[in-house]
């Protein structure tokens, strides 16, 4: 679509107008709408006339299906009910739907939309304290415990992260690769080693839903309390994969130890 060739500011403006339209399905009008994240998805803060805040996420580039989004909603609602971890609540429309499917007029593209309750605080970001990382580690453990026996409905489905690229396109080894044969060969060795360990983990570990995107911009800190959000990348995996993602974003052995202990 030519829409996605437009300057980012124009895209945001158009999607903000679309957000106002979508909010009528939730019985919300005259809200203040501001873009807070624009990338894989467009996320808007919504403040109603009475001061209640929400986060509205429009999936603009995501390959997620309605079944994937339904799985995300089912899992987060399960965590809302059972978990000692603070997570945002999915918000239903007036028709009691948690997912809205609507055509964005300016792009002509059908987009899937979800809305969550607002989380107060600041992102932990890329300079977390050791205390914060200790809380993150505890929260990941609780999330895993609460998810180990959770079962999705028949209408919902998620990918399983047992392939090297986690269901994304292969630009390393396919015909689209720009690598030299020598580089490809070296990466193939790394690939084979990684898949050997991955296959072993999948053979010996419990597989359940994982968050799969634990980093400082998906973790909120407010008055000493941690919240976890952005469940858009969740899928079936092993617990070590959640930890590997979280550790990837850390810089020092002290940080690693704080997360893991």
State the predicted function of each range:
Residues 39-48, 55, 90, 195-241:
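Active-site acidic catalytic loop and adjacent metal/ATP-binding pocket
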Residues 240-261:
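Active-site activation/catalytic loop segments of kinase-like enzymes and analogous catalytic loops
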Residues 61, 121, 226, 234-236, ...:
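Activation segment
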Residues 124-184, 207:
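A cross-family kinase active-site recognition segment
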Residues 1-95, 225:
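Conserved NTP-binding catalytic cores of kinases and kinase-like/nucleotidyltransferase enzymes
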Residues 23-30, 192-203:
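Short Pro/Gly-enriched beta-strand edge/turn motifs at strand-loop
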Residues 63, 123, 219, 236-238, ...:
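Conserved protein kinase catalytic core
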Residues 49-152:
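ATP-binding pocket architecture of kinase catalytic cores
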């Amino acid at each position: 679509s030519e829409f996605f060739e437009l300057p980012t500011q124009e895209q945001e403006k158009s999607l903000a107008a679309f957000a106002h339209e979508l909010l009528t399905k939730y019985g919300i009008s005259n809200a203040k709408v501001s873009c807070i994240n624009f990338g894989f998805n467009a996320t808007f803060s919504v403040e109603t006339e009475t001061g209640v805040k929400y986060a509205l996420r429009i999936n603009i580039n995501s390959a997620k299906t309605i079944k994937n989004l339904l799985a995300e909603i089912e899992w987060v609602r399960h965590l809302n009910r059972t978990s000692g971890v603070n997570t945002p609540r999915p918000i239903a429309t007036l028709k009691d739907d948690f997912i809205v499917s609507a055509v964005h007029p300016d792009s002509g593209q059908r987009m899937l939309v979800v809305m969550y309750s607002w989380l107060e605080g600041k992102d932990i970001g890329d300079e977390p304290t050791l205390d914060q990382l200790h809380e993150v580690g505890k929260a990941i453990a609780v999330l895993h415990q609460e998810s180990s026996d959770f079962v999705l409905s028949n209408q919902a489905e998620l990918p399983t992260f047992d392939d090297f690229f986690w269901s994304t396109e292969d630009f390393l080894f396919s015909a689209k690769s720009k690598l030299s044969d020598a580089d490809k060969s070296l990466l193939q060795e790394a690939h084979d080693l990684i898949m050997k360990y991955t296959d072993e983990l999948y053979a010996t570990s419990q597989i359940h839903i994982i968050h799969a995107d634990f980093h400082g911009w998906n973790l909120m800190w407010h008055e000493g309390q941690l919240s976890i959000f952005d469940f858009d990348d969740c899928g079936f995996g092993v617990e070590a994969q959640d930890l590997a993602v979280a550790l990837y974003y850390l810089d020092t052995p002290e940080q690693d130890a704080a997360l893991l202990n």
